[in-house]
Structure formats: C-alpha cells, structure tokens
Amino acid sequence: MMALRKTKPTSPGRRAVIKSVNSFIYKGKPFAALTEKKKKNAGRNNSGRITVRHIGGGHKQHYRIVDFCRNKDDIPAKVERIEYDPNRSAYIALLCYADGERRYIIAAKDIEVGSYLVSGSSSPIKMGNAMPIRNIPVGSVIHCIELRPGKGAQLARSAGSSAQLMAKEGDYSQIRLRSGEIRKIHISCRATIGEVSNSEHNLQSIGKAGAIRWRGVRPTVRGVAMNPIDHPHGGGEGKTAAGRHPVSPWGTPSKGSRTRKNKRTSNMIVRSRYSKKG
C-alpha cells in the first residue's frame, strides 16, 4: 500500500518533510544490463557556457533504459519487481518475458509483483497491458500514449497522470488529456491501460533546500537582484521593482504567455487546453 509519512520535527530540516513510504519498492540495485552511465555537465555546453540554468551537483545517477514502445507482442511477461527511478517521478517495473528477456516499463497504478502483463492487439483489457488504440474501448483510462505509430510513448508518462479515450472516428481517436486538451491521435498508436503509478508524488514535501541540491537543482536568483547586464529587471539604486511586466532573462513574458510554435500539428488539437471549461 502507498502511504505518506510525516517526520517528527527533530530538526528544522526534518520539520516539513513528507515522503512516500511503499513496502513494495525493491530495495536492491537496478538490473545492470538495462542501465547506462549518465554524465553530468552542470548545464554547460561543449564550450563551457551555461545553456540551462539551475543545474549542477547532485547525487550520481544511472539512466534506466525504459521500453516505451511495448512492441514485444503476445508474449506474457511477469512483473519481477517495482523500482524507484531517479530520472522520473513514476515508478518503473522490471518485466521478465517468457523467452527470458527483461525490460523496464513505466509501472501502472495497482500492478503487483508476480502479476502477468502482455502487449499486442489480442491482449486483454487489463491494468498495465499495452495495445493499439483501435483495440481499446471508448471511455477507458490510459497512459503512455504514442503520438506516432512505433515512435514510443510520449504522453501521460509522469507520476499519477492519465488520459481518457473519448471517441474513435475513422483512422483517428480523440483523447482528453489532464490539461483539458482534446487531441486527435491515430488509432494505430499504442497506449497502456490504467493510470501511472506513484499518484501521491505531488503530495510530498522536500522539506529543506539541501534535499533539492541532492537532486542536482541549484538556487534561482531573482531578476531584480541582478545587474542590468544580467536581466531586464536588474539594476536601480537600492531595492527597486522590476519596472515592467515579469519577463525571463531573454525578455519573454514569464507569467503564462503562450510560446507554442508548432503550427504543423495544430490541426490535431480538437479542443485547446486554454478554452473555457464548461
């Protein structure tokens, strides 16, 4: 069972900590054949310049190679264990297929160690099974959804996320995402039944600044505390306001301004996430 634990305030750093405690999470090391080294570059590019701010330090991590395609069809796989993955908010499950191959997948909510999963057009409608959208009943809750057939899951992959299959018309289905957006997706694209695991992720509290540093995140400096060369809000004598609407260091409005540029796929959006909810 998933549970949240609030620590006793034995120190200021422990006072605000709320963490999830799950007895089913595997305590050992990951499956070595499905891990890769992960080099840290502290947000710098090949010339040493900072290209992504607020990145640096943190605990050493290995990348887990996750199967987002789920293309090993009609071969049952046993859930050997469910693991923590430092690279994502969801848990991952190690599957052992009947032919001996092992793969990591995004763990669906309520799947258990020892249960069997299968992917393919003929697989039953069961939590954690993957299949083309054409084989999924309308109204089903799904996750790990492909945008192009065979490319691998791109939508609804983070902890607790899901989408709902609303309709099927011809070669396309209509899927409602958590944001409220309704999007057309080809029925040959694959999706997994159910909701993503670790739905209590958003209820956790890090508790102290150092725990964020363990994750490789560095502090964020306010623009008004900088010099004018560093930020549009910088400069001034003493403490001063920004003097303009909030913007990023590059002048882009930073409070909800839309920046989407991909007009090529705009015709696939049936209902925008910004439209008023009735």
From Swiss-Prot:
GO MF terms listed in the record are: rRNA binding; structural constituent of ribosome; transferase activity
Kindly state a single biological-process term from the GO annotations of this entry: cytoplasmic translation
Q: Which UniProt keywords apply?
A: Ribonucleoprotein, Ribosomal protein, RNA-binding, rRNA-binding
Q: Which domain of life is it from?
A: Bacteria
- Residues covered by region (Disordered): 226-278
| PROSITE patterns reported in the protein's UniProt record | RIBOSOMAL_L2
> Is RNA-binding included in the keywords of this UniProt record?
yes
Q: Which InterPro entries match?
A: NA-bd_OB-fold (IPR012340), Rib_uL2_dom2 (IPR014722), Ribosomal_uL2 (IPR002171), Ribosomal_uL2_bac/org-type (IPR005880), Ribosomal_uL2_C (IPR022669), Ribosomal_uL2_CS (IPR022671), Ribosomal_uL2_dom3 (IPR014726), Ribosomal_uL2_RNA-bd_dom (IPR022666)
Question: GO CC terms for this protein?
Answer: large ribosomal subunit
Q: Which family does it belong to?
A: Belongs to the universal ribosomal protein uL2 family.
Q: What does this protein do?
A: One of the primary rRNA binding proteins. Required for association of the 30S and 50S subunits to form the 70S ribosome, for tRNA binding and peptide bond formation. It has been suggested to have peptidyltransferase activity; this is somewhat controversial. Makes several contacts with the 16S rRNA in the 70S ribosome.
Its quaternary structure?
Answer: Part of the 50S ribosomal subunit. Forms a bridge to the 30S subunit in the 70S ribosome.
Q: What is this protein called?
A: Large ribosomal subunit protein uL2
